[in-house]
Each structure stands twice: as C-alpha cells, then as structure tokens.
Regions:
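Generic long, charged, amphipathic alpha-helical segments
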Residues: 281-308, 434-454, 458-461, 465
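Intrinsically disordered or compositionally simple regulatory linkers and C-terminal tails
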Residues: 364, 507-530
Length: 530
C-alpha cells in the first residue's frame, strides 16, 4: 500500500502543482531548450525533487539522478531568467545545472559534460562547453568533500580484455542494444495503454503503483533506486537465476511505473536491467565457449553502459560514465565496442530514443545528428565572385522602367547594385523600389539607396552572409574586399546560399539513407508521430 499512497500524492502534485513533474526529467529539459527558449517555471525547482523523493521513498523503482538532473537544469534556467539573459545563455545555464546534478550524484564530471553535449546543448562550442565543464567540476568537488573520492559503484579490478574476447563483448553490446529498443518501445506502449483509461491522468500513477507493490512484495530488490543492486551485479555477488529474475521484474515494475506518468529517473533502472542482462549473457557465453574468456562482471559493466547508450543515444557519455563510476582501468575497450554496437542497433531499429520519443509524439522534431555548419565552411568568394549587372547612380526612374519593360539582357534581376560616377558602390536597389508608384519618373537612382551600403566581404563565410540577410531583411548582398570596401567584385543572393548545399547533399544522401531507421521495425504508435 505504501507505493500506492506515494503515487496518489505525486498524482495530486502533478494535477494541482505542475504536470511537468511527470516523467523522468531529461526529455522535459530537452523540450524546454528546443521549444521554450530554456524557460522552466521556478516552481519546478521545488515540485520536481519533492515529487521524486516521495515516489522513490515509497518504493518507486526509479533512480534519483533524473529528477536531480532536471532540478539542476531548472535552477540554471531560473537563474538565467532572473538575470535577464538571452535564450542561448539560458540554455547554457540550464545545461550546466543539469550536468552539475549528474556529476554531484555519481562523481562523474566528464560523462556529465558529454551528456550535456549529446542531449541538451545541441552544439559543440567553447562558449557552451566551458561553463558546463566548470559547473560539473565544481559539483564533483563538492560531492568529494562530503562523501569522498571513492567510485560510485564498487567493482574489483579485472584482468586485461583483448583479442577475441572483445568480439564477445561487442556481441553482448549488440544484444543489449536490441533489448534497449524493446525497453523503450515497451515503456511508450504502456504509456499508450494508460492514455486509453477512462479516468483522469492524476490517478494513473496509483494504478501503476499497484504493480510496483505486487512485484516488490515478491522481489523487494526491485523497489527504490537500486544502487546496491548495481554494486552486487558488477561485483559478481548476484548470479544465475537471481540475475534473470531481477532483470525481468525490475523492467516490468519500472516500465509500468514510468508509463503511468509518475516522477522518477531512468538511469539507475536502465543500469540495473542492462547490467543484469549483460552479466547473464557473459555467463552464458562463458559456459558455451570457455576459451573466449568472457567475464560476467565485465559483461555486466558493458551491459549497463550499452543499455544506456542504446536507449538514450548518448554514446560517449555512456562509455565514459561506466568508466568514471567504476574506475575499471581495463574496461574502456570492451565499453567502447559494446556501446558502439548497442548504439548502432538502436539507431537502425528505432527512430527516436527514450529521451526524444515523448517530444516527437507531441509533433516536434528533435535533432539527432550534429555536424559542422556547411555554410560556415564555404567562403563568399567561392560562390559570389561573378560579373554583376549594375546601375548608374544618376539614371532616372523613367529610363530604368523603360529598360526593364524591354526585357533586355540583365533587366529581369530582382536587385541591382548602384554605382557612383567614380566607380564606387553606394547601395542596392530592387525592382520594387524602381516601380514604386509613389516615386515619380524624374527621380534619380541615387535618392533611392540607403547609405552606407550593406555589404559582405569576400573572406566572410556564407553563414555570415545568411545571418546578415536575416538581420537586415534583405535578399542580396554586394561583395567587396576589405582593402577596397567600396569596389564591387560580386554579389550573393539567397539562391546562392541554397545552391551551396547541393554538393554536401549529393555526397551525403546515399550514406544517410543507409542509416535511416527501418519502417518495418517501427510500431504504429511511433509511425503516427513522424
């Protein structure tokens, strides 16, 4: 009955406090960054940790890290709003707070920075990474002053893992990646079933808590955060049937509870499920082929990280997190291989991750691949240096209108640079300016242009040109040199910006298609969201 009571309180808090406390926190933070300019209501800084504490304290099968990450992000966002910062600055503060929350929970500053980069920042820039890194380092230092520098999860030092055994751990990672797809889809399938219930959603957590209580009665280890379970799995204390039961029941309990919309984290349950599954697979492999040298404890470590990599798509954060929290010196190669395999399987079989599926179902698109800005890599001189049709500054509108009506060569352009008698650029005029009925035929062109002219330099990037066009609300820019800023050498238009993408798209199209998720493996609920 205790989990049910806690779930009722959480449902009540969500109904009358804020519905944003539902879920595990990271998707909600991502959504605020992407679509709400990183503005998180101040009340969430209290409601989220309190609701999570009630949920976990009454037996909910969740980790505390998700709500802590969400709370840290909310604090950063609120601070940014108090200081009247820009949306970009609030995003950095939110990510710094979230990363600091993770670093303080596990003592894993590097993986916290990587998690912020892979899931929250949506960019890789010094202005973003440095504040996040400093926040994570500070949070870890504070943690060490209270609990010491011991790793979050105790694990004996294992022997060297090399040769053919690495292939075994890669295979384990692939199988755990397949399981991560099943876990993710199951959670959202259960959520879909709750949405069909003819009762208000504030009562759903109580229904989910019934399953939590029943399962917890028969297997108490499924209740609560379960960090002790992770310790026992990694140290090899749990084995055989116990591992299988814990893996299955923890998954059922957690997925039902999370699907019901209560408050709690996903990381610890994923680590428990993945670690137990990895240990079972490694033990099975060792029994079938003893010569491989598979170690169930290393299999547990790989499985723990691979489950997180497959479910969240945070590949580098998963690898480094497992290393930082266990300080297993010879675990990097198995971790990198296993997590990469899990990431690949998840990417091929599932369009969205456990972090982004909820956002996608609300009709929003979440970026999943990041690359250097192509426009930043192309200079204006590469596309904008060409002969330009110019107009003399002393021409009258009457002569220009007659020339354009004649459809003479060059007269069909939408904009024209205006050149003074000495050959210097004084501005740009458009067809709309020339044919404006409010301007008489006797007007001369010099009177129509703005001074000084808005120009772009030949050594600027196309990104600079695009930004300038947006800021000035114009569709073309004269190109000049820095040495001679009034001498026209070309022009660049919006069409040039679009055409600059053509080589990149042609080169990448075939490769990107090969990595697209397969519609065959997508469930109807996921298909309807895209």
């Amino acid at each position: 009955l205790v989990p049910i009571g806690g779930a009722i309180i959480v449902g009540w808090m969500a109904r009358f406090g804020s519905a944003a406390i539902r879920g595990h926190g990271i998707p909600e933070a991502m959504e605020q960054i992407l679509f709400n300019k990183s503005r998180i209501p101040a009340r969430l800084t209290l409601l989220k940790p309190i609701s999570a504490a009630i949920s976990i304290g009454t037996g909910g099968p969740f980790g505390a890290e998700g709500p802590i990450i969400a709370t840290g992000g909310a604090l950063g966002s609120v601070l940014g709003q108090m200081l009247e910062t820009t949306a970009e600055e609030r995003k950095i503060l939110l990510s710094a707070g979230a990363g600091a929350g993770m670093a303080a929970t596990f003592g894993s500053p590097v993986s916290a920075v990587l998690l912020a980069i892979e899931l929250l920042l949506f960019e890789y820039r010094a202005r973003s990474i440095i504040p996040v890194a400093l926040a994570c380092a500070t949070a870890t230092a504070v943690r060490m002053s209270f609990v010491g520098s011991a790793p979050a999860f105790a694990m004996p030092v294992l022997g060297e893992q090399s040769g053919i055994v690495l292939a075994g751990y890669i295979a384990i990672g692939a199988l755990v990646g397949l399981a991560s797809v099943f876990v993710t889809r199951s959670v959202y399938w259960i959520e879909d079933q709750f949405e069909k219930l003819p009762i208000h959603w504030m009562w759903w957590p109580a229904i989910g808590a019934v399953a939590v209580g029943v399962i917890g009665y028969f297997e108490p280890r499924t209740m609560g955060v379960g960090y002790d379970n992770i310790d026992h799995i990694l140290s090899g204390t749990l084995a055989g049937r116990t591992l299988i039961v814990l893996c299955a029941l923890k998954f059922i309990s957690w997925s039902i509870a999370l699907g019901s919309g209560t408050s709690g984290g996903t990381l610890a349950p994923l680590f428990t499920i993945g670690g137990a599954l990895g240990a079972v697979l490694a033990a099975g492999g060792a029994a079938i082929a003893p010569s491989l040298g598979l170690d169930p404890r290393m299999g547990a470590l790989v499985g723990m990280a691979a489950m997180f990599a497959g479910a969240s798509r945070a590949l580098l954060a998963s690898v480094v997190f497992a290393f930082e929290t266990t300080r297993q010196p010879l675990g990097l190669l198995p971790l990198l291989g296993g997590c990469s395999a899990a990431f690949l399987v998840s990417r091929l079989l599932m369009r969205h991750s456990i972090m982004t599926e909820k956002i996608a179902r609300r009709g929003s698109r979440v970026p999943s691949d990041y690359g250097a800005d192509h426009l930043e890599q192309v200079l204006v001189r590469d596309v904008g240096l060409r002969p330009v049709v110019t107009l003399a500054a002393d021409r009258t509108l009457a002569s220009l209108r007659a020339w354009m009506h004649s459809h003479a060569p060059g007269s069909t352009h939408q904009g024209f640079p205006v050149i003074a008698a000495g050959g210097s650029l004084i501005g740009v005029v458009t067809r709309r300016d020339i044919f404006d009925p409010a301007r008489g035929d006797e007007r001369i062109l010099r009177e129509l242009v703005a001074h000084p002219p808005i120009v772009i330099h030949e050594d600027d990037s196309l990104r600079d040109a695009a930004d300038l066009m947006v800021l000035e609300k114009i569709g073309r820019l004269p190109v000049v040199t820095r040495a001679a800023p009034h001498r026209l050498i070309g022009i660049i238009t919006r069409s040039d910006l679009l055409e600059a993408h053509a080589p990149r798209l042609e080169d990448a199209h075939e490769a990107e298609q090969s990595l697209e998720p397969r519609d065959l493996y997508r469930w109807p609920a996921a298909r309807s969201s895209t």
